[in-house]
From Swiss-Prot:
Limits of the Nudix hydrolase domain: 32-162
Molecular-function GO terms, alphabetical: hydrolase activity; metal ion binding
UniProt name for this protein: Uncharacterized Nudix hydrolase all7351
Stated family: Belongs to the Nudix hydrolase family.
EC number: 3.6.-.-
Alphabetized InterPro entries for the sequence: NUDIX_hydrolase-like_dom_sf, NUDIX_hydrolase_CS, NUDIX_hydrolase_dom
Record key words, sorted: Hydrolase, Magnesium, Metal-binding, Plasmid
Position of sequence motif Nudix box: 69-91
Names of the cofactor(s): Mg(2+)
């Protein structure tokens, strides 16, 4: 959906909906009180499937990203958004993959970009990803990914924090 048309719920510190705004307004105002979902695809070797965002992305173009991420649109639950984004970005059906919730994070407690639920999807093959969203991908151990990021590989802002939180030993 085009950013100018996408309406997101605005939430209070308890993640209760208090209003709505256009996605473009949220970003132009630097707000963090909206909802997102993020997922990591992990194979049986413990490697993360990490894609690189396309050059057409308005935010973080050509940066490494979580395996799947997206905004929770107004009126959706986190789980609704997970299902929609899995289909849009990775051509996966939520009911056909092994998914587990890794955690629920808030910007006030964890200094992340938004209220978020982070999931893990177990797959031993590369997803059939949407090539409008991503241009390439890598299977990396968490330690390899952290090393890349520490050496300056461009990445979406929350990526290193999420990998360290959920996958660093």
């Amino acid at each position: 959906m085009m950013q100018d048309l996408e309406i997101l719920d605005i939430v209070d510190e308890s993640d209760c909906v208090i209003g709505q705004k256009k996605r473009s307004e949220i970003y132009s105002q630097g707000l963090c009180n909206f909802r997102v979902v993020n997922s990591f695809v992990v194979n049986s070797l413990g490697k993360l499937w990490i894609p690189r965002r396309s050059a057409q992305k308005r935010i973080f173009p050509l940066c490494l990203d979580v395996s799947m991420g997206g905004h929770v649109e107004s009126g959706e639950t986190y789980e609704d958004a997970l299902q929609r984004e899995l289909e849009e970005e990775l051509n996966l059906d939520l009911n056909m993959v092994n998914t587990q919730l890794l955690g629920y994070l808030t910007p006030y407690k964890y200094q992340v970009s938004a209220f978020m639920k982070v999931y893990e999807i177990r797959l031993d093959y590369e997803p059939d990803y949407n090539q409008n969203d991503f241009i390439e991908s890598f299977w990396l151990y968490p330690s390899e990914l952290i090393e890349w990021l520490n050496k300056g590989e461009p990445a979406k802002s929350d990526l290193i924090k999420l990998v360290q939180m959920f996958y660093a030993n």
